Amino acid sequence: LIEVKNFGRAIDPAKDIAAFFEVKKMAAEIKPDVIHLHSSKAGVIGRVAFNGEIPMFYTPHGYSFLMENYKPMKRRMFKLIESVCAKRNCMTISCSVGEHQESLKLTKHATYVNNGINMAELQEIIDKTEKVEHPFTVYTLGRICYQKNPTLFNEIAESLPDVKFVWIGDGELRDQLTSENIEITGWADRSTAIRYAVNAD
């Protein structure tokens, strides 16, 4: 794992340009056979940096221009950027049917691969997990962000004070989970997350 020191989620022109040259330098040293870009920010930087030089795949994990928490002008700007980058020499791989449909509006070089679950591994972890006595427990798993609607999760928890709520994960909106019956586990590896889930209802 190699950190791109100048890479961040927020748009920062100075850091984004620095990240562009940083990944170019890394690629020159590593000489990868294939590059797989994840999320919009990496997708833009990577597709601009390596167009045609190295075979590339791009997985959006949710297009920024579809996020309703952004103002319309910002969403239009994000869509324009995606439209320009979609013309680069890259295959877009979507993880859902809806995302794939959006990808096809931008480029014909798109395919869809559903999220997969290793059922044998999952069952093995479940079988090894001790079931413990617990109050009625509701859980969710993922990053605490706008798309996951932590405000609604908090409202439901407040309306059911006798029920335990567990959020497996962490994120920038964790401060919105204020109800006393909510436990935030923080980021957990797969085995730990499954063990939390097994002891929920």
Task: Give, region by region, the residue ranges found by the protein language model.
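Donor nucleotide-sugar binding/catalytic pocket of nucleotide-sugar-dependent glycosyltransferases
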Residues: 2-3, 83-126, 137
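A short, histidine- and acid-enriched strand-loop-helix "catalytic/donor-clamping" loop
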Residues: 7-11, 54-74, 88-91
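Acidic anion/phosphate-binding donor-loop and adjacent secondary structure
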Residues: 11-15, 104, 116-135, 145, ...
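Membrane-proximal helix-turn-helix segments that form the acceptor-binding/catalytic region
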Residues: 21-25, 75-93
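Short His-centered aromatic/hydrophobic patch
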Residues: 37-43, 60
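Conserved donor-binding/catalytic core segment of Leloir-type glycosyltransferases
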Residues: 131-148, 154-158, 165-166
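Nucleotide-activated donor-binding/catalytic signature segment of Leloir-type glycosyltransferases, i.e.
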Residues: 175-194
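Acidic donor-binding loop of glycosyltransferase active sites
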Residues: 198-201
